Amino acid sequence: MNRKFSLTAALALAWLTVSALPDAANAGQKGRNGLTVVELYTSQGCSSCPPADRLLGRLAKQSGILALSFHVDYWDYIGWKDPYGSPSNSRRQRDYKRTFNRFYVYTPQMVVGGMFEVTGFDAAAVLAGIKQASLAPNVPIDLSRDGAGDLRILISASPNPIRTAVWLALFDMENKTRVRRGENSGRTIVNYNVVRDFKKSAIGTAPPRR
């Protein structure tokens, strides 16, 4: 198991959260090169999910993309308890359900840049969403460590008021699981960038740079 605390995720997810908010259209620099966050909502108990898991694995290797797997727990009842499923991931997906005005949650679902949702194994739709999301405004962010080794994230002020949140992700880069029950019984499933912890970071106000 290769677990990684993603500082890159902090940058990208800060952008993600801002980009999905109403005032974001006037923020940042349009077309600025940055990361596009792709969230896969998946479950080892879902027979339709392995193709989406493999697609996310390919996306995870591409530059300019932060691909993350959020395992949900609402399929656990059909025979296999996903070891990475969590209620918090299911809640996050339900929040997206309201954002995108959907009547239900489903797997596999990919959310691209916080702006588009597509079926998780539809590679053409996912790539089209990534292309579109990469054109969205970005909020300039600087990442550094102080003398004590603490992480500092500086989000530049914008002339237009925006709401900003910074999320930090801890994820396993690759996990292999032999599924013994449920729809995927007998299969070995490989999951990539499996989110194990996902937290909102506190934001304070720093004095302006001189």
Place the predicted regions along the sequence by residue:
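G-domain G4 guanine-recognition motif of GTPases
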Residues: H71, G114-M115
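Solvent-exposed, well-ordered amphipathic alpha-helical segments
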Residues: V18, A24-T36, S69, L127, ...
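Positively charged n-region of N-terminal signal peptides that target proteins for export
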Residues: M1-F5
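Active-site-proximal cofactor/substrate-binding loop regions of enzyme domains
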Residues: D23-Y106
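Short, conserved sequence motifs used for protein processing/export or organelle targeting and
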Residues: P83-Q109, M115-R210
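Bacterial N-terminal signal peptides
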Residues: T8-A20
